C-alpha cells in the first residue's frame, strides 16, 4: 500500500467537496439557508448574476432570511437549467403562450365560457406522406450538429447537456438507419436542432440546415394565397428548437396570435369582458392552423383575421384552412358499372394492382404483399372464368368504392354442363306452384349499401322488368353464392323459431312463446344485412328449437298391426331420433365455426329425418305395414369433440398390458402387475399421480381403468408439460409379505398430438432403462377439443332412409299437375280419380329392376316380400294403362304428357342435385339416370 503524501485534509472536507460537485444534496431547511461565511462573496454573487441574467432584487430579498420559498427555489432551478443558447433564440415577448400568469388571468375572466370555445379554423386530418428524399439529408445535418454540440458540452464539463445530446445523437442514428432502409420517418420524431456552442459556425450550420429543410417541398406562389411551412417543423415541445423565420407564415401566425392574446389581456384590464373573450377565441383558433403548418400542410392564409386594432365589430371570418384538395384528388373514383363478370374482375384487379404499387412506393412492404396476393386471386378467377368454370365471387375481396359482384356471375352464357343444368333446374323447381302457365320471371333488384346491381333472369326469354322485387324476398338465386346460403339459413332458422313459438302458445307456455318470438325478431337485422349482400356472424344465431314430440309415436296402433310390426316401428323411430340429434349437434358445431355450407348440409339432413318421422307416424296411425326403409352409406366431415368433458378435464385410460416382463424366477402366470403414472402438472412438486388396481396371475393384464386429471388449457406450464414431458408410466410387480414392489419397466407417452387432436391412443413399448423388454402398454388420453385448432375428420355412417313415395311412382311436385283428359268410358269402375301420368321409360326401368330383384329372390329360394310384389303389379298395370290412354287420347293428351315429362325432368334434376349435395352418391346416380331417361323420351316425343 502506498502512503499518500502531503498534508491530510481536514475531516468533513470530502463531504463539502461532494456537495459542491452536486453529488450530495441536503434538502433539510438548514441546508436551504444561504450561509454567510464565504458563499455570499461579491465575486460569486456577480458570477451568479451573470449566469441568471441579472436578478439582483430577488437575491437581496433572500439575504439574511430563513428557508427559501418553493416558488423561488423552482424559479432558480429553471434559470439554472436553461441554456444560454435558448436565451439568445427567444425573447420575452415570444413566450406569451407559456405565461402562466396571463393564461390564469384570462381563464379567471372567461370562467366557463372557455370550455365551450371551439376553434374557428377547422383543419383537415393530416395524411401520412411518403418517403421524403430530403429527410435523410436533414438527419445527417442534425447528426453533425449534435456531435459538435456533444463535443462542446464535453469540453465545458456540462454533464446534463452531454446526456441530453447523447440521447438525441442515438435517436438520430436510429432514424438515419431506418431512413436508409426506405422506411417512412415521422418528422415529429426528429430531435430539434441545437446550437453547437461555436458561435458563427453554429449560426452557419443552422442557416444551411434551414435552407436544406425549406428546399424539401417547393413553395407555392405568393399570389395564390397558399403558403407551405417547412416540412420538418415539429409541434410545440419542451425541447429547445430554432425560432421560425420572421418572414415565414409560421412566424406570421404566431405574431398575430400573440397580438390577439395581448389585446385580450388589455381588454380584460379595461373590464371589457366581451372584447377579451372575442380576442381570446380568435387567438385559440390559431392553434389548429399552427399545428397544420408544423406538419407541413398547405394552409389557405387568404382568410386570416386582421390585426386586433383593425378588427371590425362583426364576427371574424373563419381562419385559414388546410387545403383538402389533395386528399380529394387522391380519393378513388367509383368505377363505371361493368357490363359482365369479366370486366368487373378486371376492374377490381387493376385497382388492387395500383394499390400494391402505391404501397411499394411508400415502403410499406406488408401492404404491398397483401395487395399482390389479392391480385393473384383475381388472376386465378379471371383464368377460371375464361375457361368456362364457375367463379365464387363471394370469396374475392372487394376494393373500397366498388359494389359487390353478386348477380354478375351468371350474366354471361356458359357451356351447358351438368352442374349448370342442375342449377337451372333448381331455379325452375322453385317457381310458384300456383302458376299453371310458364310465365317469364322478371329480374329483381338487389339492394347494396354502395350501389344496386342487376341480376340474371330465371327465364331464358327477355321480358321487361315489371318493378322492383319485394323487400322480403332475396333477389339473387346463385346456388354457389355464400350470401344466398347465408340468407336461406337465416330464413329457415326464423321459420323454425316462429313454429316453436306457435307450439308453445298452443301448450299455454306463454314465456316460451315470448322467448322464441323475441329470438325470431332478433334475426331481422341479420336478414336485412344478408339481403343487402353483407356478411353476418352466424355464430350469434340462436340454436334451432327441438320439439321432443316430433320423434314420439303418440297414437295407438290399429287392430291390424302385430307386435312385430309395433317393435319395428319403435326401432325405426329410435334410429331416426338418433340421426336427428347427431345432425343438430354437428350443425351447432359448424355454426360456431361460421361454416355456412356444412351447417346448411346438416340442417337439411335434420329436416329429412323429420319428414321420415312424419311418414312413420302416418303409416302407424293407419295401421299400415312399416314403410320401405333402407340403409345408405353417408360420408360426413364432422368436428371431433368429446362433449361430456369440460375444458379443465383430461381423461387418462390405461387399457391393458401385453406380454409384460416378469422378474427373474417367476413365470408369466405368477405376475401380479399394476401400473402407476406421473403427470408433472402444475409442476414437478405437485405432480398428479395415481395407480391402477392389481391384476394377478397374468403377464397380459386388462386394467380398463380411467383417471380424470385437472388441466388449464391456457396455462403456460400445461403447454410446456405436454410438449416436453408427457406422462410417465411404471409397470410394477406387486410384492408379497416382507417383499417390496419391483419396477419391471417404464414407458413415456408424448402429448404433443393434443395440439391438433383431442385424443391420443398409443401402444407404448416398456423399457428397462433404455433396453426394450418386449412388453407393451396400451394407453389413451382424451380432452374436450384440440388446444390450437378444431379437429375435422371424415366419418361414414349407416344412414336410415325411409321412402316417402315409392320409387316406382314418383309424384311430381310441380305447378298444378293436371289430370289427363280421359274419356269416361275408359275409366275403371274402381278408379274414382284419374291416375297421374309418368314417363314410360322410367316405368320400364322400374319394371326391369323389380323383375331382376324377384328373379334373384326366387333363385335364392327366398319368398318375395309382399310390398315388392305389389310394386311390380302397380308398375305393370300403370304402364299398360298409360300406353292405352296415349294411343286413344289424341294430340291434346300428348301435349299434356309432354308437359308432365318436362315437370318430371325438373323434378329428377333437382333430386339428383340435392342428393349429391347431401352425400348420397348412389341415390344421386339413380336420380340422374332417371332424368336422362325422361330427357331422351321427351326428345323422341318432340320429333
From Swiss-Prot:
Disulfide bonds: none annotated. Residues 304-319 have a biased composition (Pro residues). The keyword Nucleus applies. Residues 186-250, 300-337, 430-483 are annotated as: Disordered. Residues 195-206, 229-238, 469-478 have a biased composition (Low complexity). Residues 339-385, 477-510 form a coiled coil. One of its GO terms (cellular component) is nucleus. It comes from Mus musculus (Mouse). PANTHER family: COILED-COIL AND C2 DOMAIN-CONTAINING PROTEIN 1-LIKE (PTHR13076), COILED-COIL AND C2 DOMAIN-CONTAINING PROTEIN 1A (PTHR13076:SF8). Keywords: Coiled coil, Cytoplasm, Cytoskeleton, DNA-binding, Nucleus, Phosphoprotein, Repressor, Transcription, Transcription regulation. Residues 630-764 form the C2 domain. GO terms for molecular function: DNA-binding transcription repressor activity, RNA polymerase II-specific; RNA polymerase II cis-regulatory region sequence-specific DNA binding. The modification Phosphothreonine is found at residue 91. Pfam families: C2, CC2D1A-B_DM14. It is found in: Cytoplasm; Nucleus; Cytoplasm, Cytoskeleton, Microtubule organizing center, Centrosome. GO terms for biological process: apical dendrite arborization; dendrite arborization; endosome organization; negative regulation of snRNA transcription by RNA polymerase II; negative regulation of transcription by RNA polymerase II; regulation of postsynapse assembly; regulation of respiratory gaseous exchange; regulation of respiratory gaseous exchange by nervous system process. SUPFAM superfamilies: C2 domain (Calcium/lipid-binding domain, CaLB) (SSF49562). This is Coiled-coil and C2 domain-containing protein 1A. The keyword Transcription applies. Belongs to the CC2D1 family. Residues 445-456 have a biased composition (Polar residues). The modification Phosphoserine is found at residues 248, 435. Highly expressed in brain, expression is enriched in the gray matter and strongest in the olfactory bulb. Transcription factor that binds specifically to the DRE (dual repressor element) and represses HTR1A gene transcription in neuronal cells. The combination of calcium and ATP specifically inactivates the binding with FRE. May play a role in the altered regulation of HTR1A associated with anxiety and major depression. Mediates HDAC-independent repression of HTR1A promoter in neuronal cell. Performs essential function in controlling functional maturation of synapses. Gene3D superfamilies: C2 domain.
Amino acid at each position: 500500500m502506498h502512503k499518500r503524501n502531503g498534508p491530510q485534509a481536514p475531516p468533513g472536507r470530502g463531504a463539502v467537496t461532494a456537495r459542491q460537485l452536486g453529488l450530495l444534496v441536503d434538502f433539510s431547511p438548514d441546508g436551504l439557508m444561504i450561509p454567510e461565511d464565504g458563499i455570499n462573496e461579491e465575486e460569486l454573487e456577480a458570477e451568479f448574476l451573470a449566469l441568471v441574467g441579472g436578478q439582483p432584487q430577488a437575491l437581496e430579498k433572500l439575504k439574511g432570511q430563513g428557508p427559501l420559498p418553493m416558488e423561488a427555489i423552482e424559479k432558480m432551478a429553471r434559470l439554472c437549467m436553461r441554456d444560454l443558447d435558448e436565451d439568445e433564440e427567444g425573447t420575452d415577448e415570444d413566450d406569451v403562450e407559456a405565461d402562466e400568469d396571463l393564461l390564469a388571468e384570462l381563464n379567471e375572466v372567461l370562467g366557463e365560457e372557455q370550455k365551450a370555445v371551439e376553434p374557428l379554423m377547422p383543419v383537415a386530418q393530416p395524411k401520412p406522406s411518403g418517403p421524403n428524399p430530403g429527410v435523410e439529408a436533414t438527419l445527417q445535418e442534425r447528426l453533425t450538429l449534435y456531435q459538435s454540440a456533444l463535443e462542446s458540452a464535453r469540453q465545458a464539463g456540462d454533464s446534463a447537456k452531454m446526456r441530453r445530446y447523447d440521447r438525441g445523437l442515438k435517436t438520430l442514428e436510429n432514424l438515419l438507419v431506418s431512413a436508409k432502409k426506405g422506411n417512412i420517418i415521422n418528422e415529429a420524431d426528429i430531435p430539434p436542432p441545437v446550437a453547437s456552442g461555436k458561435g458563427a459556425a453554429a449560426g452557419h450550420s443552422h442557416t444551411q440546415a434551414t435552407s436544406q429543410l425549406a428546399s424539401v417541398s417547393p413553395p407555392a406562389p405568393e399570389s395564390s394565397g397558399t403558403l407551405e411551412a417547412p416540412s420538418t417543423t415539429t409541434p410545440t415541445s419542451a425541447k429547445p428548437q430554432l425560432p421560425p423565420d420572421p418572414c415565414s407564415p409560421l412566424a406570421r401566425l404566431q405574431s398575430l396570435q400573440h397580438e390577439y392574446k395581448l389585446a385580450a389581456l388589455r381588454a380584460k384590464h379595461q373590464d371589457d369582458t366581451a372584447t377579451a373573450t372575442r380576442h381570446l377565441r380568435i387567438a385559440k383558433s390559431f392553434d389548429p392552423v399552427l399545428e397544420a403548418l408544423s406538419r407541413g400542410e398547405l394552409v389557405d392564409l387568404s382568410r386570416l383575421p386582421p390585426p386586433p386594432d383593425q378588427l371590425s365589430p362583426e364576427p371574424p371570418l373563419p381562419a385559414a384552412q388546410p387545403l383538402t384538395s389533395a386528399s380529394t384528388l387522391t380519393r378513388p373514383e367509383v368505377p363505371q358499372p361493368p357490363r359482365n363478370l369479366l370486366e368487373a374482375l378486371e376492374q377490381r384487379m387493376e385497382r388492387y394492382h395500383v394499390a400494391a404499387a402505391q404501397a411499394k412506393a411508400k415502403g410499406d412492404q406488408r401492404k404491398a404483399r397483401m395487395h399482390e396476393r389479392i391480385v393473384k386471386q383475381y388472376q386465378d378467377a379471371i383464368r377460371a372464368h375464361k375457361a368456362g368454370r364457375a367463379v365464387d365471387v363471394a370469396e374475392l375481396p372487394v376494393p373500397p368504392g366498388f359494389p359487390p359482384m353478386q348477380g354478375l356471375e351468371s350474366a354471361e352464357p356458359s357451356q351447358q354442363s351438368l352442374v349448370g343444368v342442375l342449377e337451372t333446374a333448381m331455379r325452375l323447381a322453385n317457381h310458384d306452384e300456383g302458376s299453371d302457365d310458364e310465365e317469364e320471371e322478371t329480374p329483381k333488384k338487389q339492394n347494396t349499401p354502395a350501389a344496386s346491381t342487376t341480376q340474371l333472369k330465371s327465364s331464358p326469354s327477355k321480358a321487361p322488368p315489371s318493378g322492383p322485387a319485394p323487400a322480403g324476398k332475396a333477389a339473387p338465386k346463385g346456388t354457389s353464392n355464400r350470401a344466398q346460403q347465408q340468407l336461406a339459413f337465416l330464413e329457415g332458422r326464423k321459420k323454425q323459431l316462429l313454429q316453436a313459438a306457435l307450439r308453445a302458445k298452443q301448450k299455454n307456455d306463454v314465456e316460451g312463446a315470448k322467448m322464441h318470438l323475441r329470438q325470431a325478431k332478433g334475426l331481422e337485422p341479420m336478414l336485412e344485412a344478408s339481403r343487402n349482400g353483407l356478411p353476418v356472424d352466424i355464430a350469434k344465431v340462436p340454436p334451432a328449437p327441438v320439439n321432443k314430440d316430433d320423434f314420439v309415436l303418440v297414437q295407438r296402433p290399429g287392430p291390424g298391426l302385430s307386435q312385430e310390426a309395433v317393435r319395428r316401428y319403435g326401432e325405426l323411430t329410435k334410429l331416426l331420433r338418433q340421426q336427428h340429434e347427431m345432425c343438430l349437434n354437428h350443425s351447432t358445431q359448424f355454426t360456431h365455426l361460421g361454416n355456412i355450407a356444412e351447417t346448411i348440409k346438416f340442417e337439411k339432413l335434420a329436416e329429412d329425418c323429420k319428414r321420415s318421422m312424419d311418414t312413420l307416424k302416418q303409416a302407424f296411425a293407419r295401421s299400415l305395414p312399416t314403410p320401405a326403409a333402407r340403409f345408405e352409406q353417408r360420408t360426413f366431415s364432422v368436428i371431433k369433440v368429446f362433449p361430456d368433458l369440460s375444458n379443465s378435464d383430461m381423461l387418462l385410460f390405461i387399457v391393458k398390458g401385453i406380454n409384460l416382463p416378469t422378474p427373474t424366477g417367476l413365470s408369466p402366470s405368477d405376475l401380479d402387475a399394476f401400473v402407476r403414472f406421473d403427470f408433472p402438472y402444475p409442476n414437478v412438486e405437485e405432480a398428479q399421480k395415481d395407480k391402477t388396481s392389481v391384476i394377478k396371475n397374468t403377464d397380459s393384464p386388462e386394467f380398463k381403468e380411467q383417471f380424470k386429471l385437472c388441466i388449464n388449457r391456457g396455462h403456460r406450464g400445461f403447454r410446456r408439460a405436454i410438449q416436453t414431458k408427457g406422462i410417465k408410466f411404471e409397470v410394477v410387480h406387486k410384492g408379497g409379505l416382507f417383499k417390496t414392489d419391483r419396477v419391471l419397466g417404464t414407458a413415456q407417452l408424448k402429448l404433443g398430438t393434443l395440439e391438433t387432436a383431442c385424443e391420443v391412443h398409443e401402444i407404448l413399448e416398456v423399457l428397462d432403462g433404455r433396453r426394450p423388454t418386449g412388453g407393451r402398454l396400451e394407453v389413451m388420453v382424451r380432452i374436450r377439443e384440440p388446444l390450437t385448432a378444431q379437429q375435422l375428420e371424415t366419418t361414414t355412417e349407416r344412414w336410415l332412409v325411409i321412402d316417402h313415395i315409392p320409387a316406382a311412382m314418383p309424384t311430381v311436385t310441380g305447378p298444378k299437375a293436371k289430370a289427363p283428359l280421359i274419356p269416361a268410358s275408359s275409366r275403371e269402375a274402381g278408379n274414382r280419380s284419374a291416375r297421374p301420368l309418368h314417363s314410360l321409360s322410367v316405368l320400364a326401368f322400374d319394371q326391369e329392376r323389380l323383375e331382376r330383384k324377384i328373379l334373384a329372390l326366387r333363385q335364392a329360394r327366398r319368398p318375395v316380400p309382399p310390398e315388392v310384389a305389389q310394386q311390380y303389379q302397380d308398375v305393370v298395370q300403370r304402364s299398360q294403362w298409360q300406353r292405352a290412354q296415349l294411343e286413344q287420347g289424341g294430340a291434346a293428351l300428348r301435349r299434356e304428357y309432354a308437359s308432365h315429362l318436362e315437370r318430371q325432368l325438373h323434378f329428377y334434376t333437382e333430386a339428383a342435385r340435392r342428393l349429391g349435395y347431401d352425400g348420397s352418391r348412389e341415390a344421386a346416380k339413380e336420380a340422374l339416370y332417371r332424368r336422362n331417361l325422361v330427357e331422351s323420351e321427351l326428345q323422341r316425343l318432340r320429333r
